[in-house]
């Protein structure tokens, strides 16, 4: 294929290539599946991107929805044609994706729909100076529906049926207003089409009902009697609270919560049957009520021992330590249940960072505490798992990721260098100043859902 001609001028002062506008008809060749360099607005540099969709504006120009290669899909965006580097365009291979259907830009039409365990083995804790290991620095969701219209009825969030349907790869909501915050969503969420065609969706921060205008929101707030999430307040400390919400008893709230979360989670499938799930909503309290900052959900009965199905901190409240707080709370519940738990996989990139950070700190604290309580004694991975409620596989993977798990003279040992010990002791001390879960403020007892069902059947 002959590449389209493009005139380039060298800037005399900076030597930067400038592109002279090309014939608009040349952009007709750029179809779904094409890869080319695109000027990324957030970084002001060209990056390789794949064209997901395109549409024609009323003035006849074409704009393209692109996914930047090797970047998270929350960075996907609509771009004008002048940000494309046509000289770099690579057409999709034969047998690949079909070309995109060009649509007329209409806020009430299809464009917006598209935007639419082994044996217990004692592991010796070697003296800090016996062996040296390299220093390792530890780290800090509902993808698409199975179809573009009607989701299956299974559970609120699930990995089943993760789809790459082009329509659901396109962010279909431009903006939401939740409380005092206006937020740009990251991913597709199946809100009603008549709302996704609007510039902004307005959401009540207490009941999470979605409305089409500021006026409708004001009218709703005059009637809405809620000033906190439904369900039971099971934790309250330092103006932070957790509310436990049964997905069967509070279906409307649970479904609205899942829709809201889908805007910011990409690795799970959204379903409308919330009955099998419990939701734990974290709130900040002020004179007006309890304002949602994040949540996690879990299955009432999980054969895989998952203690978290989905977890999310809303963007305005990120980087405040709330992610670690949600994770810590989920493990406090597991400790009361006397079970080990693990989050449902896969985790988002941000979720994985948060979990690795929590696991690292929790495991290191337990190792140091064990060393003080039982000097000279050995510890097993199972011991660590039971004391922290972190599943055995996650304990092992964390020790390996920190380069602490070594094979030595026929058995596995945990090796902590003086350097690492000092680093983690400082981090543990610094963590004491951060917001933490106070177990004494947690008023909760686990429910045996399986036993109740068995009694009813009997």
Swiss-Prot record:
Residues annotated to bind acetyl-CoA: 311-313, 318-324, 348, 357
A single BP term in Gene Ontology: negative regulation of DNA-templated transcription
Active site: 344 (proton donor/acceptor)
Cellular localisation: Nucleus
Posttranslational modification: Autoacetylation at Lys-268 is required for binding histones with high affinity and for proper function.
SUPFAM superfamilies: Acyl-CoA N-acyltransferases (Nat) (SSF55729), Chromo domain-like (SSF54160)
Pfam family, one: Tudor-knot
ZnF bounds (C2HC MYST-type): 201-226
Domain Tudor-knot: residue ranges: 30-86
Record PTM N6-acetyllysine, positions in chain: 268
Record's keyword terms, sorted: Acetylation, Acyltransferase, Chromatin regulator, Developmental protein, DNA damage, DNA repair, Metal-binding, Nucleus, Stress response, Transcription, Transcription regulation, Transferase, Zinc, Zinc-finger
Region called Disordered, residue ranges: 1-24, 94-123
Limits of the MYST-type HAT domain: 168-446
Reaction(s) catalysed (UniProt annotation): L-lysyl-[protein] + acetyl-CoA = N(6)-acetyl-L-lysyl-[protein] + CoA + H(+)
EC number: 2.3.1.48
Compositional bias of kind Basic and acidic residues: 101-116
Function of the molecule: Probable catalytic subunit of the Tip60 chromatin-remodeling complex. Plays a role in acetylation of nucleosomal histone H4 and perhaps also H2A, probably acting as a component of the Tip60 histone acetyltransferase complex. Acts in the determination of vulval and distal tip cell (DTC) precursor cell fates. Involved in the positive regulation of transcription factor daf-16, probably acting by histone acetylation; thereby modulating stress resistance.
Complex formation: Interacts with transcription-associated protein trr-1. Probably a component of a complex with histone acetyltransferase (HAT) activity, at least composed of mys-1 and trr-1.
Protein name: Histone acetyltransferase Tip60 homolog
Lineage: Eukaryota, Metazoa, Ecdysozoa, Nematoda, Chromadorea
């Amino acid at each position: 294929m002959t590449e389209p001609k493009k005139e380039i001028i060298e800037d005399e002062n900076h030597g930067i290539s400038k592109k002279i506008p090309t014939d608009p008809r040349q952009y007709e060749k750029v179809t779904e599946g094409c890869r080319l360099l695109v000027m990324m607005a957030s970084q002001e540099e060209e990056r390789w991107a794949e064209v997901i969709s395109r549409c024609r504006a009323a003035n006849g120009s074409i704009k393209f929805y692109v996914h930047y290669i090797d970047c998270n899909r929350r960075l996907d965006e609509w771009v004008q044609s002048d940000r494309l580097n046509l000289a770099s365009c690579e057409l999709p291979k034969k047998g690949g994706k079909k070309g995109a259907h060009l649509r007329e830009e209409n806020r009430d039409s299809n464009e917006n729909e598209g935007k639419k365990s082994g044996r217990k083995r004692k592991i010796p804790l070697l003296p800090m100076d016996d062996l040296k290991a390299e220093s390792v620095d530890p780290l800090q969701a509902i993808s698409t529906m199975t179809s573009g219209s009607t989701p299956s009825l299974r559970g609120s969030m699930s990995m089943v049926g993760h789809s790459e349907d082009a329509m659901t790869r396109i962010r279909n909501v431009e903006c939401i207003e939740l409380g005092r915050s206006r937020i740009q969503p990251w991913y597709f969420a199946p809100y009603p089409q008549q709302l996704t065609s609007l510039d902004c969706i307005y959401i009540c921060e207490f009941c999470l009902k979605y409305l089409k205008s500021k006026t409708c929101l004001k009218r709703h707030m005059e009637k809405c009697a809620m000033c906190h999430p439904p369900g039971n307040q099971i934790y309250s400390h330092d103006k932070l609270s957790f509310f436990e919400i049964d997905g069967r008893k509070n279906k409307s709230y649970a479904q609205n919560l899942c829709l809201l979360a889908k805007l910011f989670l990409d690795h799970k499938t959204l379903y409308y049957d919330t009955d099998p799930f419990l939701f734990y909503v974290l709130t900040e309290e002020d004179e007006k009520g309890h304002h949602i900052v994040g949540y996690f959900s879990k299955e009432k009965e999980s054969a895989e021992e998952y203690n978290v199905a989905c977890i999310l901190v809303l963007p305005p409240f990120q980087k405040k330590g709330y992610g670690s707080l949600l994770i810590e709370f989920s493990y406090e519940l597991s400790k009361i249940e006397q079970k080990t738990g693990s989050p449902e996989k896969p985790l988002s990139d941000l979720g994985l960072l948060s979990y690795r950070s929590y696991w690292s700190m929790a495991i290191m604290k337990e190792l140091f505490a064990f060393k003080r309580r039982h000097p000279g004694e050995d510890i097993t991975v199972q011991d660590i798992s039971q004391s922290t409620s972190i599943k055995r596989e996650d304990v092992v993977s964390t020790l390996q990721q920190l380069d602490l798990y070594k094979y030595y003279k026929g058995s596995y040992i945990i090796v902590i260098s003086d350097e690492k010990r000092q680093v983690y002791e400082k981090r543990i001390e610094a963590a004491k100043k951060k917001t933490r879960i106070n177990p004494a403020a947690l008023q909760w007892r686990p429910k045996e859902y399986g036993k109740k069902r068995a009694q009813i059947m009997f």
